[in-house]
Amino acid sequence: MFDQTTNTETHQLTVGKIETANGTIKPQLLRDAVKRAVTNFFAQMDGQEAEEVYEMVLSEVEAPLLDIIMQHTRGNQTRAANMLGINRGTLRKKLKKYGMN
């Protein structure tokens, strides 16, 4: 469940970059963090075969993303959907999928 506390730093998502009160954060930072996490995951697999990695990675990234966006918007689904670039119905389905409704 998402916490409706206020976020002290104002974020504005834009195509290709994230604008914050402190300047621009390049999406490459996020990509690098995901790459490190997936690399570490496979290192821990110790040669074992992994299955459904795509779905696992998406759900492990999507759930905290939704939680953080919902916190930032104080539970406002319309604002959250706009920030994510998806429609509100899709957001509702995703929130339900992760038990955040």
Curated annotation (Swiss-Prot):
Q: Does the keyword ATP-binding apply?
A: no
Which UniProt key words apply to this protein?
A: Activator, DNA-binding, Transcription, Transcription regulation
Q: Where is the signal peptide?
A: none
Task: Identify a single GO molecular function assigned to this protein.
Answer: sequence-specific DNA binding
The record's function comment reads: Activates ribosomal RNA transcription. Plays a direct role in upstream activation of rRNA promoters.
> Which InterPro entries does this UniProt record tie to the protein?
Fis_DNA-bd, Homeodomain-like_sf, HTH_Fis, Trans_regulatory_Fis
Q: Name one Pfam family in it.
A: HTH_8
Family, according to the entry, reads as follows: Belongs to the transcriptional regulatory Fis family.
**Subunit and interaction comment:** Homodimer.
Q: What's the name of the protein?
A: DNA-binding protein Fis
The feature table lists the DNA-binding region at: 77-96
